[in-house]
């Protein structure tokens, strides 16, 4: 009986437990399948909203804006909640299988109860987070720097005293407006640049220094625009405001600031009140400007003026001979002749620089005697003196390239590659795989002769305004009235219409860059016109007649006209070799384009509205094709047409189509001419295998909005796929790769293959939620030995490093790196990155700027005290 009684109690308990379980949890168990499905759906919605937000963030950050803290907080919560949700969902199949009794109960009642509860709670969390993820704004502008450093290329000789006296004059209590005047090329801009930079090194109580280049033909609105951008006032509605409205905005901003306004290269009086500049004396603010004319100083009503004069003889001789030591010692009579030539420069720094550099290469006394005869006397015109350096250029092609470079506006920096492509289009140099070598050789010749000046990044060049005047003077026949219409250069002249030309039949080159021209309707009757530059205007309409009578036009640049949607027939342009339609709003290519049998260069980059191009193979002589960031669907058919182009030597391309990408990666012939490759919205691969040969010539590589867990690099001489790591051979090297950008890519854990990009200058890694290391920690020890064998120094030429929104990133590289050219590090929202690969020897002699959140910088670990003092002094 006892045994039966015991069993009865046990059964009762089991029944009671089952009844209790069913009564308490039947709805929870019965609805588990629905709750799991709802959680999956809501997580997908949250991930989609996150991805859309990341795209908006990318656009804003590309504009220099900083991510809002509330948006960053939301993204961090999303990453956390999504990971937690996926962990819960990974158990869903097992838990659903455990349901029994018509899904009213579970084989593991207590555990399933807890699981069902966690699903419901997480669903509520995700729904709540989804509702919070609606943001009108995602980013805002950061603090305005007090001063922006100015770089100057001219050798500083003999200006020490005038810099000090100018600074002291500006600091005088009674001086609010200072005028600096002197002839062209005397060093006024260099002087003003040094004054600007003193605000970085000398203690002062100014709130902001503002630099504006005025130049010829200034407009109030253009000056207002530059000031507005510096004050962070410029926005999308700026163009619709009147000058008076903008002036009021600028005035309100400056009234409560102690400002320093530096206006360079003023040719006429500028009404400061119309611009919105408050009276400087009221709160100790200062305004200084440079001009070639003392008359401008008088018209401006300056409180004090300073004349910048030519150098005294000792300083002039020092500047002239600074690179001549070996030359002066090569013959005993050369110093005497050199002094004769130096004196003819009249102490003008620009002439001394230009002529001195030219003469430094002449080693024989005969060459020096010949140079003396070029100058007619001490009173020779400065353009004639400067022309000597032009005449000394041995190659006629180099001379032609130099003269072409004057078609751009004053102070206009143009990319070296862009300039070379113009030269090819004009037929000055031939296009080929070696184009850059020849073009860069010519640029090197011109920069060494001080006829072109390199930008800070070395990627762009510009002309000194006096040198540009000389080039335009030469192109127009050195003052010969009969040739004055050969060249029409009205760049940055505030034109609203195509200018009237007195003798159209004489015109060979026309540059109307950077104006406000909206329509080009009247026919150009220019039978000799070879070059027409209309880039960076406001073009909306080009009539059929406009281009009907320019039979030998070779270069046509319509780029940077975003409102230009339709184009007339290009059938009359049968001589055209160069066509740039980048950054326009065109929706289709013009009629007659495919009949242009002489076309060598076609640029369709950033034509977002252009969706298709047809029969590209009908352009048999095309050598350069640029399709980066266009809206064109690069289908497998189009890729095969590009494959068949026999003369192509430069290609940029954005691939969104998986079939097109497979054909592209499968043909190593693309390697010889693909300069830039962008993979966009690629989510078809668990492992993307990229043949080394396909990207060995690429200068930039971008991967964005993609899910690719692994990037593998296939070797160039075997069928084995080699992940760039310890087994990489010496021949695996991305020798040409200069820029890498990865944006919103999931799955990638590291970027170890970047070690073998020895010339990488820019690395931009943003929104990679899974990346843990830039260079894999597990491979570093073996990589180090491989690098030594291959002669590779990781990141030795890296200049700019940007890492943002990398929640799992723990390290860049295990050991400190030399970073021989590093200029800037930008870190944001990388909470697990606690140390940079720097020591006290890193970036030696470089002034590295580290931009990061203050809290993150304070918590950063440093190699030692010396390293911290070097990069983050207290």
From Swiss-Prot:
UniProt cross-references to Pfam families, sorted A to Z: LRR_8 (PF13855), NB-ARC (PF00931), WH_DRP (PF23559)
Entry coiled-coil feature ranges: 22-74
Keyword Cell membrane: no
InterPro entries named in the record: Apaf_helical (IPR042197), Leu-rich_rpt (IPR001611), Leu-rich_rpt_typical-subtyp (IPR003591), LRR_dom_sf (IPR032675), NB-ARC (IPR002182), P-loop_NTPase (IPR027417), Plant_NBS-LRR (IPR050905), WH-like_DNA-bd_sf (IPR036388)
Signal sequence residues: none
Chain positions recorded as ATP binding sites: 182-189
Family of the protein in this entry: Belongs to the disease resistance NB-LRR family.
Purpose of the protein: Potential disease resistance protein.
Name by which UniProt lists this protein: Putative disease resistance protein At5g05400
